[in-house]
């Protein structure tokens, strides 16, 4: 297990069932809640709030899309004071087949997120549409994504869909990290990507 900036990896992501809009809990390797994520329902533009607690009393970040559903939408991450922390951008046409995102800070690209094998997600979506068989799709196919600091560099985080009935589960695994590296912005960016990719299937 790797302790980075109060987060002990791996991190487990679980979507709550029967909720208007997505609800996502993030726990660390000890089972401690790291984030509670709420995606607002019935919004033309994506709007997400990341809280430090499940009671939703301590907001940490707000993520808002810059436009109504668009292949190249940018998602602005701000702190409680409204200051920009980062911008997550889905790279348009390239993301139709294989998910590809960039994370920007101060106009510079600081992280790149990529899907490992797009065929896995395609098969997962096909099987999920078959009655009865769809109940087991979550145990057969596990789409995975990586986050690195630049194109072609070794990934520092890996995100994998986990086996689960009826609910979405993902895991964020630490890979090539320095002992003092802070990844809070990276993890929050991953949460936005997971919300978007889950909606895509």
Show which residues each predicted segment covers.
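Low-complexity or membrane-interfacial segments used for flexible interactions
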Residues: 2-61, 65-73, 80-85, 91-201
């Amino acid at each position: 297990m790797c302790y980075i900036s109060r987060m002990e990896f791996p991190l487990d992501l679980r979507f709550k069932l029967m909720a208007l809009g997505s609800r996502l809990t993030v726990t660390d390797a000890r089972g401690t809640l790291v984030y509670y994520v709420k995606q607002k329902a019935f919004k033309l533009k994506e709007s997400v709030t990341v809280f430090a607690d499940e009671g939703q009393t301590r907001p940490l970040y707000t993520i808002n899309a810059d436009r109504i559903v668009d292949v190249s939408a940018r998602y602005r991450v701000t702190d409680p004071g409204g200051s920009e922390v980062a911008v997550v951008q889905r790279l348009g046409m390239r993301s139709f087949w294989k998910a590809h995102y960039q994370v920007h800070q101060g106009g510079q690209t600081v992280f790149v997120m990529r899907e490992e094998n797009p065929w896995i997600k395609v098969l997962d979506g096909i099987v999920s549409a078959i009655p009865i068989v769809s109940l087991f799709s979550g145990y057969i196919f596990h789409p995975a994504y990586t986050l690195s600091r630049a194109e072609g560099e070794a990934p520092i985080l890996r995100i994998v869909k986990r086996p689960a009935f009826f609910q979405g589960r993902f895991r964020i695994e630490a890979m090539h990290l320095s002992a003092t590296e802070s990844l809070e912005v990276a993890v929050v960016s991953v949460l936005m990507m997971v919300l978007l990719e889950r909606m895509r299937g």
